[in-house]
Structure formats: C-alpha cells, structure tokens
Amino acid sequence: MNYRDLTLRERQVLGIIIQSYVVSAMPVGSRTIARNYNLGLSDATIRNVMADLEADGFISQPHTSAGRVPTDKGYRYYVDLIMNVSRIDEEEKRMIDDRFSNRNSELKGTSAEVLGTAARVLGSISRQLAVVLPPRLSNAVFERLDIVQLASSRIMVVIAIQSLFVKTIVMELNAEISRQKIDAVVDVLNERLPGLTLEEIRSTIAQRLSDFKGSEELMNSIVSSADTLFDESSILEQLYVSGTENIVDQPEFKQPEKVRDIITMIEDKFGMARLVDNAVPSALRQVSECEVAISIGTENRTGKAADLTIVSSPYFAGKMIGRVGVMGPKRMNYEHAVRVVNYMAGCLSEALSGNN
C-alpha cells in the first residue's frame, strides 16, 4: 500500500489513537490525547492533525461520536511503519515452553497432539482465536504403509507420512483375502514407495507396480485408489482451532448476526485454511528468523472477515510448511499478537523437527 509520508506529529497521534482504541474500544478525541499524553501539543493543534489524518483516510469518525477510530489504512500504516515489536514476555515464553519443551518426550510421534496443544496455548495467551494449519503434504515423503484386516473383505490402510502424520482409509474389497496375501502386498509397497512424495506416488504407482505378481486384486485396488489413498488435501480437515470465546466476547461482535457470521466462518475449515494461507501476500514483517504475515480487514479475501485481522507465521516440519496464527478484531494488540505467533511458530518447528 502506498502512503504519503506522515509527519512526526501525525505518526505520534495516529499511534496514540490506535493504542488507545485497542485498550478501550472507544473513539479517541483530541482532548483525551492532549490530557493523557505528553506531546507538548495543544488540543487545537491535535485537532488539526487529526483532521489531516482523517482527510487522508487514516482515521474516521463514527456517526455518534466526536472521537475518531482507525481505518484499515490507518492500521496498515501503523503495522508497516510505526509498530515496534519487542521480545516475548518471559512469563508467556515460559508458559509455551512448559507445554512443548517439557512434554516433548510425551508428544514425540503424535503430531496431532502437538498441533492441538499449539492452538490451545496460543488461543489462551493471545486472547484471540488461534488457528493451526497442518503442513502441506504435496511434497511430503511417504514413509510406510500398513493394512489392518477388519473383516474377510474389508481392510483399513494406514499410511505414515514422514513420521509426522498418519492417514487411514477403510476399503471394501470385492472378494475375501487372506492375511498372507495382504502381507505380500504390504511388503512390496514398503519396498518400492518409501522416499517418494505423495504426488510422485499418485502419478507413478501403476508403472512402479506393473510387474507385481501375487495378490493382483488387492494391488489393483490399491493402485486404482491411489488418488484417494495418497491425496494430501484431506489433511486440511484436521485444522486446529481454539479460542472461539475470545473472539465472540469482543465488543465488535456482540450483535447476533455478527456472532452467527463468526461461528459459520469457524465451522468452515477449508474456508478458514484459505483465509490464513492467503494472508501471506498482503504484508510481511521480519521478526527473528520468521516472516509474520498480517492481513487487515478488507485485505482478507472474504466479506465475512472484513472486520478481522489475521496474524500468521510459517512453521516447518522437515521440508513441509504449515502456518500458525491468530484471528481477532482489527482492534487487536498487534505487537503482542506478532510476538506470540512468531514464538509459537518457532516452538512448533522445533517440536515437529524433534518428531521427524
């Protein structure tokens, strides 16, 4: 977004309006700024500065108030050019560390629990709605496959992906099959597929297994179902969300229709995943070694999120990349959100690397 260069006074007043509005949820007037902040400016001078900010679209006046509130443009300027992000609070750091570092042996090998824990802790500490997207698995490496026989013609295929995720699918066969034939198929699959990405398996499995002789019916069922068995998109159904009460308790969302919109949005896991994923292009701030994306109001790609800000950061599990973030009102404490999201992303990367 392009802006004109704000003067020092304009930056100071805009920053104060945003910081005050974040705390009080009330429009901010020139008299409040003159009385509570030592800027060395008169009420009249502050009024003039606010008039210039309003004329340029950084703040606006609600219908029933003499004060002003930030616009999306004002928040964006603040995030890009005024906000100063410090290190995470030691107490909050300790709370996160206690749930990850001290429990790493307990969580080892159970990535679903790691991601669920991250969402719960982040929601509690940020006091926003926390969202954790599992890593994209299109470039994930297949590790092994097992088949559990549920009945004479019914099996459950269990696929382990890079020691991090397990996918299960129940299949009905056209005829009964023995355990011996199942084991023969499993042995061949675990000999020829490990080290391939799911995408590579989907596109080449038929030719890789074309010379197999033995349990052809089961192997043919595996090959014909490869697009489903080795499809990564269903992993998004495991989106982890926590802290719904944090967002619906905000003054901005007290009206019943707003609450309904929020709940509907949260229940749409694919829509939520797209929202967080698509937050990346709008603005990136370098914090430590992670890029934190901040998408504000109308920058979000759905009308239901026009009153929300999304702060997110990537985390890493081997070569796979997921995202962790928070959603809340545009009137959020941006510095705090960036700090805790960034730190949580680092903890997730460390925990999942430990599982790998």
From Swiss-Prot:
InterPro entries assigned: GAF-like_dom_sf, HrcA, HrcA_C, WH-like_DNA-bd_sf, WH_DNA-bd_sf, WHTH_transcript_rep_HrcA_IDD
Highest taxon of the lineage: Bacteria
Secretion signal span: none
State whether keyword Transmembrane helix applies: no
**Record key words, sorted:** Repressor, Stress response, Transcription, Transcription regulation
List the GO biological process terms: negative regulation of DNA-templated transcription
Q: In Gene Ontology terms, what is one molecular function of this protein? A: DNA binding
UniProt feature coiled coil, ranges: none
| Cited Pfam families | HrcA
Q: Does the keyword Lipid biosynthesis apply?
A: no
Report the sequence similarity comment from the record: Belongs to the HrcA family.
Give the NCBIfam families listed for this entry. hrcA
Record function comment: Negative regulator of class I heat shock genes (grpE-dnaK-dnaJ and groELS operons). Prevents heat-shock induction of these operons.
Extract the HAMAP family matched here.
HrcA
Name the UniProt record assigns to this protein:
Heat-inducible transcription repressor HrcA
Organism of provenance? Chlorobaculum tepidum (strain ATCC 49652 / DSM 12025 / NBRC 103806 / TLS) (Chlorobium tepidum)
